[in-house]
């Protein structure tokens, strides 16, 4: 399993994003990172962060809306080809089937996972831990029908919702 437990908060704006510090990122895969996000809550933040990270690292960042034409290849061409999975923490990110499956894919493929809380978007680690500890019930209430999609995606990988819930709890406890 990948190293877990990295957490940060990001606020956009100001001069630091206009002229960010540079680093010499040496990617081991095609992308320095994969940005996992709930488009309705953090779509513009994800685009801004992608642009910022690409300038800082001088390396490509995977963002599904710009780098993928076929969602079936999201895992093989996205998550598996990224050095790190960055989850943009917003209120509903853990209720989205694709975001959950991206987390699972990263977990099973040994891709490190970092949570970045997007300020002002309602993410709370306490709420997220409660959600993970009552995963099946909470997911169905928060996003009716999502559980079925997640179960289907996990089944194709030989996994269960309980496996995902345990990995999610581990990730959130380490953050």
Model-derived regions: residue spans:
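Short acidic-hydrophobic, aromatic-tinged amphipathic segments that line or gate anion-handling sites
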Residues: 175
């Amino acid at each position: 399993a990948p190293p877990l437990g990295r957490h940060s908060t990001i606020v956009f704006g100001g001069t630091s994003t206009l002229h960010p510090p540079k680093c010499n990122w040496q990617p081991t895969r095609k992308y320095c990172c994969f940005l996992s996000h709930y488009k309705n809550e953090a779509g513009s933040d994800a685009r801004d962060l992608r642009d910022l990270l690409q300038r800082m690292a001088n390396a490509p960042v995977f963002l599904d809306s710009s780098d993928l034409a076929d969602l079936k290849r999201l895992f093989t061409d996205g998550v598996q080809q990224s050095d790190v999975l960055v989850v943009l923490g917003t209120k509903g990110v853990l209720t989205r089937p694709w975001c959950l499956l991206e987390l699972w894919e990263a977990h099973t493929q040994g891709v490190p996972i970092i949570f970045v809380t997007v300020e002002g978007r309602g993410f709370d680690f306490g709420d997220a831990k409660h959600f993970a500890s009552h995963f099946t019930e909470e997911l169905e209430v928060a996003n009716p029908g999502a559980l079925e999609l997640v179960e289907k995606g996990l089944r194709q990988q030989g996994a269960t919702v309980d496996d995902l819930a345990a990995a999610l709890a581990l990730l959130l406890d380490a953050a």
